Protein backbone atom coordinates (compact mmCIF):
# COMPACT_ATOMS: atom_id res chain seq x y z
CA UNK A 1 0.00 0.00 0.00
CA UNK A 2 1.26 3.48 -0.88
CA UNK A 3 1.92 5.86 2.00
CA UNK A 4 -0.27 8.97 2.27
CA UNK A 5 2.83 11.07 1.58
CA UNK A 6 3.33 9.43 -1.83
CA UNK A 7 2.39 11.31 -4.98
CA UNK A 8 1.36 10.31 -8.48
CA UNK A 9 3.54 11.23 -11.46
CA UNK A 10 1.81 13.58 -13.89
CA UNK A 11 2.51 12.81 -17.54
CA UNK A 12 2.49 15.98 -19.58
CA UNK A 13 4.62 18.76 -20.94
CA UNK A 14 4.48 22.47 -21.56
CA UNK A 15 6.57 24.93 -23.52
CA UNK A 16 6.56 28.71 -23.59
CA UNK A 17 8.23 31.24 -25.84
CA UNK A 18 9.92 34.22 -24.27
CA UNK A 19 10.42 37.13 -26.62
CA UNK A 20 10.77 40.88 -26.94
CA UNK A 21 7.29 41.48 -28.37
CA UNK A 22 4.71 42.93 -26.01
CA UNK A 23 2.41 40.28 -24.62
CA UNK A 24 -0.39 40.13 -22.08
CA UNK A 25 1.92 38.38 -19.61
CA UNK A 26 5.50 39.31 -18.82
CA UNK A 27 8.30 37.97 -16.68
CA UNK A 28 9.07 40.79 -14.27
CA UNK A 29 11.52 39.02 -11.99
CA UNK A 30 13.37 35.81 -11.26
CA UNK A 31 14.76 34.31 -8.08
CA UNK A 32 17.38 31.65 -8.59
CA UNK A 33 16.98 28.99 -5.94
CA UNK A 34 19.61 26.98 -4.19
CA UNK A 35 19.85 23.35 -3.22
CA UNK A 36 18.44 22.79 0.26
CA UNK A 37 19.04 19.45 1.97
CA UNK A 38 17.33 18.71 5.29
CA UNK A 39 18.70 15.16 5.27
CA UNK A 40 15.40 13.45 4.44
CA UNK A 41 15.80 10.08 2.71
CA UNK A 42 12.21 9.05 1.99
CA UNK A 43 11.72 9.11 -1.78
CA UNK A 44 8.01 8.44 -1.20
CA UNK A 45 7.75 11.83 0.51
CA UNK A 46 9.24 14.21 -2.04
CA UNK A 47 6.98 17.05 -0.92
CA UNK A 48 8.74 17.07 2.45
CA UNK A 49 12.12 16.99 0.71
CA UNK A 50 11.25 19.96 -1.55
CA UNK A 51 9.35 22.17 0.92
CA UNK A 52 12.49 23.67 2.52
CA UNK A 53 13.79 24.75 -0.90
CA UNK A 54 10.42 26.30 -1.79
CA UNK A 55 10.44 28.14 1.54
CA UNK A 56 13.94 29.46 0.93
CA UNK A 57 13.08 30.69 -2.58
CA UNK A 58 9.85 32.38 -1.48
CA UNK A 59 11.62 34.17 1.38
CA UNK A 60 14.49 35.20 -0.90
CA UNK A 61 12.06 36.52 -3.53
CA UNK A 62 10.15 38.62 -1.01
CA UNK A 63 13.39 40.02 0.36
CA UNK A 64 14.96 40.69 -3.06
CA UNK A 65 11.91 42.51 -4.42
CA UNK A 66 10.88 44.20 -1.17
CA UNK A 67 7.47 42.56 -1.25
CA UNK A 68 5.14 40.84 1.16
CA UNK A 69 3.10 37.73 0.56
CA UNK A 70 -0.01 39.84 -0.14
CA UNK A 71 1.74 41.52 -3.09
CA UNK A 72 1.05 38.36 -5.10
CA UNK A 73 -2.39 37.18 -6.15
CA UNK A 74 -1.01 33.66 -5.89
CA UNK A 75 2.20 32.06 -4.70
CA UNK A 76 2.22 28.82 -6.65
CA UNK A 77 4.46 25.86 -5.89
CA UNK A 78 5.11 23.02 -8.31
CA UNK A 79 4.43 19.71 -6.66
CA UNK A 80 4.73 19.81 -2.90
CA UNK A 81 1.36 18.11 -2.50
CA UNK A 82 -0.66 18.08 0.69
CA UNK A 83 2.18 16.91 2.93
CA UNK A 84 4.75 19.31 1.48
CA UNK A 85 2.32 22.23 1.61
CA UNK A 86 1.77 21.68 5.32
CA UNK A 87 5.53 21.66 5.92
CA UNK A 88 5.95 24.80 3.78
CA UNK A 89 3.31 26.61 5.84
CA UNK A 90 5.06 25.59 9.08
CA UNK A 91 8.48 26.72 7.83
CA UNK A 92 7.13 30.08 6.63
CA UNK A 93 5.13 30.59 9.83
CA UNK A 94 8.39 30.27 11.80
CA UNK A 95 9.68 33.18 9.68
CA UNK A 96 6.55 35.24 10.33
CA UNK A 97 4.81 34.65 7.00
CA UNK A 98 1.37 33.21 6.30
CA UNK A 99 0.60 32.37 2.66
CA UNK A 100 -2.42 30.13 3.28
CA UNK A 101 -4.85 32.58 1.64
CA UNK A 102 -2.99 32.94 -1.64
CA UNK A 103 -1.01 29.70 -1.94
CA UNK A 104 -1.72 27.16 -4.66
CA UNK A 105 0.17 23.95 -5.39
CA UNK A 106 0.08 22.45 -8.88
CA UNK A 107 0.28 18.92 -7.45
CA UNK A 108 -2.84 19.54 -5.41
CA UNK A 109 -4.67 21.28 -8.26
CA UNK A 110 -4.08 18.74 -11.02
CA UNK A 111 -6.01 15.90 -9.39
CA UNK A 112 -9.18 15.67 -7.35
CA UNK A 113 -7.94 14.01 -4.17
CA UNK A 114 -11.42 12.95 -3.08
CA UNK A 115 -12.44 11.10 -6.23
CA UNK A 116 -9.06 10.08 -7.65
CA UNK A 117 -7.38 8.94 -4.41
CA UNK A 118 -4.01 10.44 -5.27
CA UNK A 119 -2.58 10.48 -1.74
CA UNK A 120 -0.47 13.66 -1.52
CA UNK A 121 -1.27 14.79 -5.09
CA UNK A 122 0.55 15.01 -8.40
CA UNK A 123 4.27 15.25 -8.97
CA UNK A 124 6.89 15.63 -11.66
CA UNK A 125 7.92 18.43 -13.98
CA UNK A 126 4.85 17.86 -16.16
CA UNK A 127 2.67 18.78 -13.20
CA UNK A 128 3.89 22.39 -12.99
CA UNK A 129 4.20 22.76 -16.77
CA UNK A 130 0.65 21.78 -17.68
CA UNK A 131 -0.88 23.64 -14.74
CA UNK A 132 0.99 26.79 -15.81
CA UNK A 133 -0.08 26.35 -19.44
CA UNK A 134 -3.69 25.31 -18.96
CA UNK A 135 -4.76 27.08 -15.77
CA UNK A 136 -2.38 29.78 -14.55
CA UNK A 137 -1.59 31.56 -17.83
CA UNK A 138 -5.28 32.02 -18.73
CA UNK A 139 -5.84 33.66 -15.31
CA UNK A 140 -2.99 36.08 -16.02
CA UNK A 141 -3.97 36.73 -19.63
CA UNK A 142 -7.53 37.60 -18.61
CA UNK A 143 -6.28 39.91 -15.87
CA UNK A 144 -8.05 37.96 -13.13
CA UNK A 145 -4.61 37.61 -11.54
CA UNK A 146 -2.25 40.59 -11.83
CA UNK A 147 0.95 39.15 -10.34
CA UNK A 148 1.98 35.68 -9.28
CA UNK A 149 5.11 34.04 -7.94
CA UNK A 150 5.56 30.69 -9.68
CA UNK A 151 7.89 28.37 -7.75
CA UNK A 152 8.30 25.00 -9.48
CA UNK A 153 9.95 22.51 -7.16
CA UNK A 154 12.35 19.65 -7.75
CA UNK A 155 13.80 16.70 -5.86
CA UNK A 156 17.40 15.88 -6.74
CA UNK A 157 17.71 12.12 -6.71
CA UNK A 158 18.58 9.19 -8.90
CA UNK A 159 18.35 5.42 -8.67
CA UNK A 160 22.00 5.38 -7.60
CA UNK A 161 21.56 7.94 -4.81
CA UNK A 162 18.37 6.17 -3.70
CA UNK A 163 20.05 2.75 -3.60
CA UNK A 164 22.99 4.21 -1.67
CA UNK A 165 20.62 5.63 0.95
CA UNK A 166 21.53 9.24 0.22
CA UNK A 167 19.29 12.11 1.28
CA UNK A 168 16.97 13.79 -1.24
CA UNK A 169 17.82 17.49 -1.57
CA UNK A 170 15.27 19.88 -3.01
CA UNK A 171 15.52 22.91 -5.27
CA UNK A 172 13.08 25.60 -6.36
CA UNK A 173 13.38 28.66 -8.57
CA UNK A 174 10.96 31.57 -8.57
CA UNK A 175 9.48 33.39 -11.55
CA UNK A 176 7.36 36.52 -11.16
CA UNK A 177 4.69 36.66 -13.88
CA UNK A 178 2.52 39.74 -14.33
CA UNK A 179 -0.49 40.69 -16.41
CA UNK A 180 0.23 43.66 -18.65
Predicted ranges, named:
Residues 13, 50-57, 68-71, 84-88, ...:
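General structural feature for long, well-ordered alpha-helical segments within catalytic domains
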Residues 128-129, 134-164:
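Internal helix-turn-beta structural module
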Residues 41, 45-52, 75, 79, ...:
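A short glycine-/small-residue-rich loop at the edge of a beta-strand within enzyme catalytic domains
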Residues 94-131:
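Conserved catalytic cysteine-centered active-site region
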Residues 1-59, 64-67, 101-108, 147-153, ...:
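Condensing-enzyme catalytic core mediating Claisen C-C bond formation in acyl metabolism
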Residues 8, 15-21, 123-143:
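Active-site-proximal alpha-helical scaffold in enzymes
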Residues 80-95, 160-167:
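Short glycine/threonine-rich loop-to-helix capping motif typified by GTGT followed
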Residues 71-78, 149:
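Short glycine-rich phosphate-binding loop at a beta-alpha junction
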Amino acid sequence: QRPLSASWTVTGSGAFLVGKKKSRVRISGVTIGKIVDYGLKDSQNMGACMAPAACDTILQNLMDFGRGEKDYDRIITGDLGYVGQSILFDLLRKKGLDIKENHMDCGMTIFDQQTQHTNSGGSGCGCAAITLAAYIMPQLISGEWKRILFVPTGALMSTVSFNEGESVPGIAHGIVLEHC
